Amino acid sequence: FISKGVPVYLGEFGCVNRGNAREQAFQQYYLKYFAKLSKTYGVPSIIWDNGAHGAGNERHAFIDHGTGEYCSAEAKAAIQAMITSYGNSLTLEDVYRNAPK
């Protein structure tokens, strides 16, 4: 589509909020990689945020819809991981090499 001049937008990607530090590290890795992939190929994207607080299935609260504040320190860390992936000096390979073990 893109090569033919057709605009592409990727919405509603995400990874549910996680309950422990190891799971949160993998969530941040996924979001960071996906955001960098999106930027690398010029496809605008947005994270899915349904406002459901907590951890587990269908829990995608990142930004409080009423106040505009982060929902939690973990949500802020996830969003910050995505923001850092937009830097021009960071490559997909860099993100991949720094995946949680």
Regions found by a protein language model. Give the residues of each.
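Aromatic-rich peripheral "rim/lid" segments of glycoside hydrolase catalytic domains that contact
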Residues: 20-101
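Glycoside hydrolase catalytic-domain groove-lining segments
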Residues: 1-16, 39
